Amino acid sequence: MPELIHIERQLGLIDQYAPALTDHERVGFELGWDYAHYRVALPARYAQEASPLRDGVRAGEATFGVRTLAATRHVRKWLQLRLHAWLRGRSVELVQITPNYLQQLEVSHCPITRVPLSSATLETSDASIDRVRNDAGYAAGNLAAMSTKANHAKGAHGFRSALQCVQRIEAEQLPGLDGLTAEQWARVAVLCSFVEPLSHDEASALPLLVLPPNRLRLFNPVQALQAFVSQQLLAPGWSQRVSRFEELLPGKNVQRDFKAFFMALLPRVLEGSRLYEQHTARWAIEDAWRAPLVQQRWAQFARQLDAAQCEALLVKAAARKLGAGTRLQPHTDTAATDGWNLATRGYVPHRSPGGLQEMRQAQLC
């Protein structure tokens, strides 16, 4: 409750300065207000230009004076992300997208190119936040950290168009497209597939060429099950957990096919994970899925289930604490895309002045 009261008070203060702005203008004003609240200077090109952003900074400075908050590295990243989004008219859902949330997305290596991620070097290895589903805004469940190179190459591509890049590279025997190899484009395709609703059969046929990034929402239950089983190998005690999971499966035929799949996956992972670092262990799992036998046996197992059964298995496994540190949080279809602004393809909705205020108040209730 104290956090909600703080937000309500802050919105009330902003309303005194910006009572009649369009939604996009108000978003800019609130962003400037937060720049002032954390005493972070606007980039030079925007500091002198008349805009709701600069108005928000001035109003915030008049309100807070020297009573400002500490600007941590993640606060600065949060402000930078919001500025980048506002300049393009993209929406940012601010109830869940916080500096702490962005911190939880951090990884040591790019999931697409696998290069070590840098920070503020102006190189293509610099870490960036990608909207995995391009027709959605910056919202919880739709974000992943990757290199600037991978982010720029991915652009507006989704699952099917990324697959087409793979097919073109292979058909024309190209070294790559837009700086990514066929193998890297295949990872982009799988990453995008996580947040796009697919039929159960189609999702069952996809190899897990990239493990889901932290906090990403998986729309297809069979892929969530695929990731859950694969990630067992990232933590000690996997043998006992996998045996207990097998007991949850409906019938001997399904159990037999699951065991056949796992025995195809396991030796390939163990062979590829001689280094005991987290990122190399993840890569070993991802690379094991490149083996046709692994994918064939997975599809044979998974197609004996339906989406509802996959989801039920995950709920049962979570109840028995078989997650190996993986947090499973089911969402309804509506909750899964809350704040994504799919209706406006990820752009700030065009409402009349005061519209955003009413929406924010509804979110707080």
Set out the residue ranges of the language-model regions.
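Catalytic cores of phosphodiester-bond-cleaving enzymes
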Residues: 33, 37, 56-57, 63, ...
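Histidine-centered nuclease catalytic patch
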Residues: 88-102, 106-148, 153-158
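Polybasic, low-complexity binding patches
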Residues: 132-144, 152-199
